[in-house]
Amino acid sequence: MTSLAERAAQLSPNARAALARELVRAGTTFPTDICEPVAVVGIGCRFPGNVTGPESFWQLLADGVDTIEQVPPDRWDADAFYDPDPSASGRMTTKWGGFVSDVDAFDADFFGITPREAVAMDPQHRILLEVAWEALEHAGIPPDSLSGTRTGVMMGLSSWDYTIVNIERRADIDAYLSTGTPHCAAVGRIAYLLGLRGPAVAVDTACSSSLVAIHLACQSLRLRETDVALAGGVQLTLSPFTAIALSKWSALSPTGRCNSFDANADGFVRGEGCGVVVLKRLADAVRDQDRVLAVVRGSATNSDGRSNGMTAPNALAQRDVITSALKLADVTPDSVNYVETHGTGTVLGDPIEFESLAATYGLGKGQGESPCALGSVKTNIGHLEAAAGVAGFIKAVLAVQRGHIPRNLHFTRWNPAIDASATRLFVPTESAPWPAAAGPRRAAVSSFGLSGTNAHVVVEQAPDTAVAAAGGMPYVSALNVSGKTAARVASAAAVLADWMSGPGAAAPLADVAHTLNRHRARHAKFATVIARDRAEAIAGLRALAAGQPRVGVVDCDQHAGGPGRVFVYSGQGSQWASMGQQLLANEPAFAKAVAELDPIFVDQVGFSLQQTLIDGDEVVGIDRIQPVLVGMQLALTELWRSYGVIPDAVIGHSMGEVSAAVVAGALTPEQGLRVITTRSRLMARLSGQGAMALLELDADAAEALIAGYPQVTLAVHASPRQTVIAGPPEQVDTVIAAVATQNRLARRVEVDVASHHPIIDPILPELRSALADLTPQPPSIPIISTTYESAQPVADADYWSANLRNPVRFHQAVTAAGVDHNTFIEISPHPVLTHALTDTLDPDGSHTVMSTMNRELDQTLYFHAQLAAVGVAASEHTTGRLVDLPPTPWHHQRFWVTDRSAMSELAATHPLLGAHIEMPRNGDHVWQTDVGTEVCPWLADHKVFGQPIMPAAGFAEIALAAASEALGTAADAVAPNIVINQFEVEQMLPLDGHTPLTTQLIRGGDSQIRVEIYSRTRGGEFCRHATAKVEQSPRECAHAHPEAQGPATGTTVSPADFYALLRQTGQHHGPAFAALSRIVRLADGSAETEISIPDEAPRHPGYRLHPVVLDAALQSVGAAIPDGEIAGSAEASYLPVSFETIRVYRDIGRHVRCRAHLTNLDGGTGKMGRIVLINDAGHIAAEVDGIYLRRVERRAVPLPLEQKIFDAEWTESPIAAVPAPEPAAETTRGSWLVLADATVDAPGKAQAKSMADDFVQQWRSPMRRVHTADIHDESAVLAAFAETAGDPEHPPVGVVVFVGGASSRLDDELAAARDTVWSITTVVRAVVGTWHGRSPRLWLVTGGGLSVADDEPGTPAAASLKGLVRVLAFEHPDMRTTLVDLDITQDPLTALSAELRNAGSGSRHDDVIAWRGERRFVERLSRATIDVSKGHPVVRQGASYVVTGGLGGLGLVVARWLVDRGAGRVVLGGRSDPTDEQCNVLAELQTRAEIVVVRGDVASPGVAEKLIETARQSGGQLRGVVHAAAVIEDSLVFSMSRDNLERVWAPKATGALRMHEATADCELDWWLGFSSAASLLGSPGQAAYACASAWLDALVGWRRASGLPAAVINWGPWSEVGVAQALVGSVLDTISVAEGIEALDSLLAADRIRTGVARLRADRALVAFPEIRSISYFTQVVEELDSAGDLGDWGGPDALADLDPGEARRAVTERMCARIAAVMGYTDQSTVEPAVPLDKPLTELGLDSLMAVRIRNGARADFGVEPPVALILQGASLHDLTADLMRQLGLNDPDPALNNADTIRDRARQRAAARHGAAMRRRPKPAVQGG
């Protein structure tokens, strides 16, 4: 040993570490440290058997689980590759392995990796990233804390399977392959993403890779290259090729098991997985108080050298590496009781390994030595090859840590070549405790590589380094849950809650908080859960996960942001009994502050503050209240300070300025208490004099109002919109009454004496005198005065006199503070200034307003929640122990190369033709392939109005390729003798993930050859998309193009601008199709472009005319259109649909020039053109003549069925439990109206009435007034609501309607449903017509009426209310109508109470809710899925069918569909005789089936029976019924009449019931109801139709639950047919007849119960209906439409503040113009906004009441205020609406004439009157709609 080492050995660990670093910097090493112990402090792993971490791995080992399984089908076909003969070509001798699930899943977003890069990354790299992160979390080392540190990464990798997979798809290889698959990138990426500065080394020594990596990591630590090391390895089996090769060696077990050391050993079975360990020097780990799992005492590596073969093991080398490791570890072999062997289970390898083990660890048997067990984890999970070493290492670490040796599987007797009799070695066949030993437990791990590299590691039990538990448990714990997004925070909270309820139930809460706060990464988003105990913590975490508010939960959006804190001290009014009691008991800093203040308090005030708080009695009298409040405020300030929260400025409100002065240092506590005591004592003399009132008026309005009351003065400037007045009680009450008439808030403020008023004047001289000797100091913290405008007041006697007398300038002070400060904390026992603060500060979210206590909530929990919101968690200051929390939950997505089998097939065949079959007759040919976007992802870059569409160029290439292939041209050769004529796209082909395509080449009898291209519908029908004629011509190749001698000159157009223009017309060309690199527009009406095939477009030798090239050439025709003549609009686009001829002369290559000519620029329905493609040599490569571009409307673009079908599904959504007193008390304070049916003539009604009565008794409280009425008594309802709305102290908050079922008979239910709907419209009229404040929320309550599960019949009467809910969401969104279905078998009112208490929380609300037991379900609109595999025939040949509403447009479409499908008899019901047009249709159908018309109203008795009887006449087999009868009469709920409701209700709902009853004895295949999208999506003006449709929906559910066939389709509007065309608007496009028939076929075949079918306009839904953002039902739609529905960059009303009046008016006008254009369906805004003037009434543009409602709702979303619907309908113009909004926003309009609201309304009324007079003179006949 060197002298340096000897001296260094005497140093402390810290000193030795510092010396070692210096030596490393000097270029030398530290020789004694090669033996330094290394601590294992963390483990991450994923192994077969669903092992996701050390706990699950140990459980697998302890249970002796064998994880080997047959090769999963997503890897390869095990049977196809299997052959027991090792010599079989291309086959393997095994079907088995150990596999990790979901190897294609990765959380790329978490690591900031793009999807494109993630696809190119080897999954081994991906899993290594995630497991490395998990290992650091297990170690308690926040990964982000390692950035910039000397942390090393050493990982073993040897497999290249994913590289092989990528090479198979060489056409799609991109730049990311170079960093996605090399092994060096795996470690480099970890170092890069975590910012690690230590060595990053990838190790490939085959099977020993990961153990060698661990050895290198230990060496690096000892040499001080690194301070922390991540070491391990990964192996995934993605390709069969390695297994095939190993089979040729006979290395793999034919039985699929590793029988280590056993006589049955026949080879190994491959496994896969990943393991990572976190290593530190033991001294560092002890210093850092890390949890040490085990210690690496020594390790060694060597090579076999020359042996019997390169892959043959060498016993001597294995013995040497073991000996070296033991020597370096300085331990004897007999101290090792367990060896984790290489143990592959091969006939050759096992005996050789045992020989080396016997020569080292085996000696000593019979000499009292303890035995040594041999194990191999390969018997559990297979041979993990590159990860095998780390798997065994982790097993050894866990074994020594837990003192238990797991059993070895598949061992019965020793391999005959092994003699263990003379050794201490044995194979444990049962798990057993570790043998007793004098020293620490020790184990060893061996790993031997195929190429000869060996590694051996000695592992030892960790020394006792446990951190002592904290001395005392905190009263509360703060759990910080962090994530990169709010969604990740929610999922982390859910996982943690589940863990704390299950595996982690025994973990102390303080340790959980400590681990979260100190040992986890802090991401951009974090939330905090404050809890006293485990149950509270779990409930808080679940609330956080569900997005529900709860006491003690601070979500991601509640944390204060920005610099600058202001402590705000309130005036009188925040006191309450028992304030501060919990804080005295729980918070030492608060108790200390009170105790230190108490002697001063007693001396100045005369009684004990401390005793007052302990007693908890109510403090009475102004002379006691004010001093106690100041004492409380000073103690609360010290509480904040004890956690490091210090104010940067202070503000006091009235008496609160005393506390502010003390905190700022201007007064001492003694002086402050003297001031408040003197002040309050003098005020007590005036007790009972004067009154004060809070007014919802700004200062100017308040001054103007009280000008007539000389004794009333302005006392407080509370906020920009609120003031407080003071004066004689009678005058104050008069002012209150005057304000109340304006529907504004006005109420008394409870005070002993009216301060800040002349009433105070008599005591002011004495106050000045008593405080004359006060000597204030300059404040150390800025005071922002509410008494004077001076920046820093002098807190002398004059100041305190003015403080009591002057008006409180609170909002001015807050406004001034808000310039430089972001967080305002109210210091008081209860928040009383919150509203004033939030009302004053800007609402853009840059300021945070908080409080300190809340009298209705747990004081300690509430304070710590506020503390967390500031960014401080109390438990961050406490100690604790690291616990094994669940790791970060990954948000996995699938990343994988394109399907390999498809790629292999495409490599051999044309990409768009596919498999070829030559027909036996006529020389016809057929090709079949899949052109879906999953198989051909590049085609997804060709979109029309957002939908991937097969380009016409693609069809043209298919025709060319088919003709060339069938006519004998080589697959990769151009065929100049082939001409395509009369090419036509008959119907666009929408592309889905998988889109099968069939191409047919037909030789006609006239020697003509045709190509036809088909897809197949879900109903099995072929749909022809394109046709072409093929001609074989001897035409010679064209040569040089006369105009192609050089680039043309003209007007250059930017390709980016050109593509942007195309996007405006609905054409989107993604990277694969954006091929134009140069565009020059020429004067002769042509354009020359340069085309380069993008890298994203695939290459293939089979292309004759690459679709991307031809598509770009067709784009060039559009580029030839002159400036100003846009080829299309937002609602229509010009698309190529036919070509006269296509000729290809020579190979195009990747680059070509194009000359495009416009031959006809007619702006009508189409344009004509031709193109010439010129190669680089100047030769013509191809020509296309007679190109026709047709104008295609947006609604004509087909969509796949999956994009048109919707469902309303139930989702469990728990509500956060609310402790009493509830936090939502403020949201329920006010007046409530409870309505129920007073008649109890049915059990359901009696139940509802009883529930209503119980609710009234429970809900009444001092803060809630409850009124009642009979729901069916209209006058009583109106009177009750007038009474509810008449109490200004308790404004209306909610209307609760209890709805009961009529009886078990459906006909009674039908009438009850209709009557209930009508009665609820009365409630709406009462609210909308008589109340002008914030609308109360409407609650509809039923008991078990909704069908949540499929087997629940429900009651149609209750379910019909869903239609009303959906419509009111748009007509009156402010009412937030909600249907709650309670479980009457449980405690329904508890659930209802929870709903009402939580109603005010969150930005979204649930509108249809069902409780089942304690489980809460909500309805969500979702995309539906369809499975047509059931495949039963939809229409039976020759059978009979009935269609109600059969003579309507939709009925006749259904009739034709039935006849086309083979129906024998179709009975059509109708109310009138057929028209001539209908007779013509019927006559045509009659030629193919028997058509019978039955006249009558299906809602009338006997008509339905007649329809069924007719269908069954003469032995007809009735197999299906379609109920399509309908009448629509648009009407807003507010104005709907009872007759209107009945006319709509009868055919849809009553008719459905009649058809249900009439078919009771029929054996039907299906009973289909045609319902409306209005009941699924909602539609303003469609309340009656929506409710009737919802009743039909529920009847279908009732039938299914009763075992009867039934289905319903909620149709959106059809084009040209159906009475529901009124629903067409800017949100729903019409369904074509073909689309409707496809849906009808598919949905009946799939046997779905309920499905909505509609073409939802993704680009306009949020524009037309901004209110859906606040409705949780539409969450999925909102997420889909957020980007598409944007109306541009609108900053909200705040964006107008900095504009001058003229600019503000223009901004408002432009925004309203965009809104109106979207609602009314104008694509050209100039229709709405002509140049000048802007006073054309909107009603003259076609505006109706429904549009007016939507314009109002849009204005509310944009500006926060709304124009009245009546104003819009009275003839208002865009100019008028702008003026009204400017007035409401408080912006001065530059046109003074428009500032008066009466002027605006008068002008609109005059226009309306003139139009009405003209209309009466014309007297048109009323329109009648029929069904």
UniProtKB/Swiss-Prot annotation:
Requisite cofactors: NADP(+); pantetheine 4'-phosphate
- What superkingdom heads the lineage? Bacteria
Stretches for region Dehydratase: 910-1076
What region holds the PKS/mFAS DH domain? Answer: 910-1198
The annotated consequence of gene deletion is: Disruption of the pps gene cluster abolishes the production of both phthiocerol and phenolphthiocerol derivatives.
Look up the EC number in the record and give it: 2.3.1.292
Region annotated Acyltransferase sits at: 566-876
> For the region C-terminal hotdog fold, what residue ranges are annotated?
1050-1198
PTM O-(pantetheine 4'-phosphoryl)serine: list the residues. Answer: S1745
Locate the residues binding NADP(+): 1440-1485
The annotation note on the cofactor reads: Binds 1 phosphopantetheine covalently.
Name the segments for region: N-terminal hotdog fold.
910-1037
Q: Which SMART domains match?
A: PKS_AT (SM00827), PKS_DH (SM00826), PKS_KR (SM00822), PKS_KS (SM00825), PKS_PP (SM00823)
One Gene Ontology term, aspect cellular component? polyketide synthase complex
What role does this protein play?
Part of the PpsABCDE complex involved in the biosynthesis of the lipid core common to phthiocerols and phenolphthiocerols by successive additions of malonyl-CoA or methylmalonyl-CoA extender units. PpsA can accept as substrate the activated forms of either icosanoyl (C20), docosanoyl (C22) or lignoceroyl (C24) groups from FadD26, or a (4-hydroxyphenyl)-C17 or (4-hydroxyphenyl)-C19 fatty acyl from FadD29. PpsA initiates the biosynthesis and extends its substrate using a malonyl-CoA extender unit. The PpsB and PpsC proteins add the second and third malonyl-CoA extender units.
Protein name stated in the entry: Phenolphthiocerol/phthiocerol polyketide synthase subunit C
The lineage is: Bacteria, Bacillati, Actinomycetota, Actinomycetes, Mycobacteriales
